[in-house]
Amino acid sequence: MRQANTTDNQILSLIECNNEEVKQENSNKNPTINSVQRDYMAGEVSKDISRRLLLPPEIIEAHDQGIIHFHDMDYFAQHMHNCDLVNLDDMLQNGTVISGTMIEKPHSFSTACNIATQIIAQVASNQYGGQSISLAHLAPFVQISRNSIRRDLREECEMTGQKMDEKLFDAVVEKRLRNEIARGVQTIQYQVVTLMTTNGQAPFVTVFMYLNEARNEQEKKDLSIIIEETLKQRYQGVKNEAGVFITPAFPKLIYVLEEDNITEDGEYYYLTRLAAKCTARRLVPDYISEKKMKELKEGNCFPVMGCRSALTPWRDANGKYKFYGRFNQGVVTLNLVDVALSSGKDLDLFWKIMDERLELCYKALMCRHNRLKGTLSDAAPILWQHGAIARLKKGETIDPLLYNGYSTISLGYAGLCECVRYMTGKSHTDPEATPLALDIMKRMNAACNKWKKETTIGFGIYGTPLESTTYKFAKTLQKRFGVIPGVTDKNYITNSYHVHVTEPIDAFHKLSFEAQFQSLSTGGAISYVEVPNMQNNLEAVLQVIRFIYDNIMYAELNTKSDYCQVCGFDGEIQIVKDESGKLIWRCPKCGNTDQSKMNVARRTCGYIGSQFWNQGRTQEIRDRVLHL
């Protein structure tokens, strides 16, 4: 053992709610609640075991110094993976088993939605990252319900002796069907935000809305009805304790832009207008361009896993592409700013240090991989035996799923912006500095390709969505290198390849610039534009959406969606400094600063956060400039 147990103080402080670091570690967990505290206690034990027994000293040292970040150490003691695309289609069509109970193919849309939420909860409790489901997998059950409603209505007519002409009959069927679809969609929305998983939080789930995923025209029309209802209900929001509709954090929604919904004369353009209206009010959906994704992903369009982690195309033995039922093994992030500062602006030394740090990341990633190796399917039957990921037998290991690119493992990166600014004295948006930024991306890709060739494991680079870690990285950089203007003078560093939040740039130039980095971020990334309240300017939102379709694979619009429970203010709650210099949230109307009496929703790491953030991330949110 390298040291004795060190968890006592951490655990006691989080139980008594006086551990500021834990309080603001995750913007979707309320650390005062018993179930969340139990998860955090387990996390402290896992971190302690990982530090003392499971991870090599050089990995722990690099993690503590902020050279790398070994993600989710609080779950590393267990044999758990990160995120996945749930094969909901297989589970609904062929049945599944939940908690030892056989669940057969549902006989209605509403039942399918109910089963889907049970699957979501079970999956979330057996992994630590996000999951994605597709509404296309629910669409076949619309016709099943339609047929059932038709039968029931005919029986009612026969029983009552009532006669209906075919047109009226069909209208009544469709009205009842719409009501059932509304109930089913509402079930998913409310179950997701009210469920509590073993992780002490609502499931991190993404709902994918892709019309061209439907298998036939009727199914596509039915899918469009589900999408329409999903957007309408999200636009409305969910009620808080005061009974006021607010913006929920989950499920995250992704809407795919495609040929028949992107132009005004497109058959499904009305859905895109509804999506734009929803985004302007509720921050979602986010947008994937079918056109750009197909260019980058061998002609395929598919969901990201949770927030942004992306699979690479993979074919089965029959040469058929497969995406659902695949997963990510885990993430280790490289602090690019530390690489730059360690080089002292010597470019040759920079590349030497970069290669050394990449090897360190490889060792850390192999620790993640080896922790999963040998895991029995019995560890999480819902995942490995009953269809969410696979249909393995009891007692089988998951090893075959860890190789040959079936699953991915991610080399994350952060601070490309500050890294390049230090090395060149310029923003990476400057034409003189951009080539270095692209070379850094290519160097990381080359390393991943080399490792993949040597091991057959699906390495890929990933634009890390730092949440609390942004503050940690900033503080370790300041400690090691001091405060350097434009580089370490903030309490945060920039996520992935993003343009610095303070840099003036319009939405269209930002998306165009970042698109070239997104295409190099093979393991996933997302771009965003910061916008003011756009509810009265939907045409501008639609203009940005059309630009996304033509120029970038995956992007989102960030707006503000807040509510003060003291005075009823519905607008942007502001970030100000208190007497001690600490950043706090204050209602501009009544001055309320009690976080328990306000609802604040901001996008901080791809997901919407609603439980507030540490000082570093709060400063980053305050510093964001508008792009429109």
Could you describe each region identified by the protein language model?
Residues 591-628:
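Long insertion/accessory domains within large nucleic-acid-processing enzymes
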Residues 4-405, 426, 430-593, 599:
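Conserved catalytic cores of very large enzyme subunits
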Residues 136, 337, 401, 409, ...:
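Flexible, active-site-adjacent loop/turn segments at secondary-structure boundaries
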Residues 409-422, 442, 603:
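Contiguous, well-ordered alpha-helical segments that form the cores/surfaces of helical PPI scaffolds
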Residues 412-415, 523, 606, 616:
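Glycine-centered flexibility sites
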